[in-house]
Amino acid sequence: MGFWKFSPFLPLSILVLYQVGIIQAAPFRSALESLPDPAVLPEEESRLLLAALVKDYVQMKVRALEQEQETGGASLDSPRAKRCSNLSTCVLGTYTQDLNKFHTFPQTAIGVGAPGKKRVMARGLERDHGPHIGTSQDAY
């Protein structure tokens, strides 16, 4: 079954192998030896190439910033925009996050009865979990 997936590549690979055979039959080295080394550029050409690369990079960044400003800071590449493609889903997710944050905050003892509440809770714990040696549970 895997052969049918690669069947379009079969004629292409045959063509490539045929071309390689023709290239090996022709004198190949003499043509390359006459060319200068392509990796060595004159200093002026390398400076021009570097300047062109920097210019293109700056233009690309300017276009990206302009596009981001047009979309209001929420480009399609940002994770928030991908998650919030549907407005109701985005609002529901935001409310769920806020509700989760509200419930995970530690409770603080603020108010009129706060100091006494701790003492009452401590007495209840002592009474419920005190020593039960020789006494029944109903004695309390």
Swiss-Prot record:
PROSITE patterns: CALCITONIN. Residues 26-81, 120-140 form a propeptide. Transmembrane segments: none annotated. The modification Proline amide is found at residue 115. Disulfide bonds join 84-90. Keywords: Amidation, Cleavage on pair of basic residues, Disulfide bond, Hormone, Secreted, Signal. It is found in: Secreted. GO terms for molecular function: calcitonin receptor binding; hormone activity. One of its GO terms (cellular component) is extracellular space. Its main location: secreted. Residues 1-25 form the signal peptide. Calcitonin is a peptide hormone that causes a rapid but short-lived drop in the level of calcium and phosphate in blood by promoting the incorporation of those ions in the bones. Calcitonin function is mediated by the calcitonin receptor/CALCR and the CALCR-RAMP2 (AMYR2) receptor complex. Belongs to the calcitonin family. This is Calcitonin. It comes from Equus caballus (Horse). The gene is CALCA.
